[in-house]
């Protein structure tokens, strides 16, 4: 019985990429089986309450997967989203996460997190889902990310926002309509317009 349960835990870790205690509860498995697998080296603790099979192929964006698992309400944004989409030369030391304005900040995350709060409409707009290391990660689209960079230019720097805009226009020719739509949602049309005209 115990051996069968530990096999199920390992299978769940391989299927989901990263597992949490709530994933075990949902599958009807006890946490003690994780401890047995940890002791045998068949599973590894990658963060507080986060476990993965050691044979799991790890991507360069594993931090996004682990933080998304720890904070499912959050959306990867700003510098982290720019890095994911290849729109910056920046290497953020924190995972940037957008939360709705009334949401609680995640208390326990496996990596340092920088939180920004958005209105409900701005938070919902432009979300894409990507699978990273077997985990579904909510991340803003490239156009929404660029608009957010102008909205939070005082936090990340106007130079980063302008670099992101230029890189976006090079990679996404004809993507100005989407960019302008998100600029309206984020209320940064006036701020962004001169940079958009200069880059065109």
Regions found by a protein language model. Give the residues of each.
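Nucleic-acid-binding surface
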Residues: 3-27, 33, 38, 46, ...
């Amino acid at each position: 019985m115990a051996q069968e349960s530990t096999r199920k835990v390992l299978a769940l870790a391989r299927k989901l990429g990263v597992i949490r205690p709530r994933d075990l509860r949902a599958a009807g498995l006890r946490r003690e089986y994780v401890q047995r697998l940890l002791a045998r080296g068949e599973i590894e603790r990658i963060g507080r309450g986060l476990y993965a099979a050691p044979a799991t192929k790890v991507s360069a964006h594993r931090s996004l997967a682990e933080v998304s698992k720890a904070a499912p309400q959050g959306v990867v944004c700003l510098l982290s989203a720019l890095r994911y989409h290849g729109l910056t030369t920046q290497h953020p030391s924190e995972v940037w996460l957008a939360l709705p304005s009334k949401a609680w900040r995640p208390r326990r995350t496996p990596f340092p997190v920088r939180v920004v709060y958005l209105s409900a409409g701005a938070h919902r707009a432009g979300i894409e889902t990507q699978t990273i290391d077997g985990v579904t990660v909510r991340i803003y689209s490239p156009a929404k990310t660029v608009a957010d960079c102008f909205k939070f230019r005082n936090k990340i720097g106007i130079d980063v926002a302008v670099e992101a805009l230029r890189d976006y226009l090079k990679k996404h020719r004809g993507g100005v309509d989407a960019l302008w739509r998100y600029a309206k949602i984020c209320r940064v049309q006036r701020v962004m317009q001169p940079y958009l005209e200069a880059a065109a």
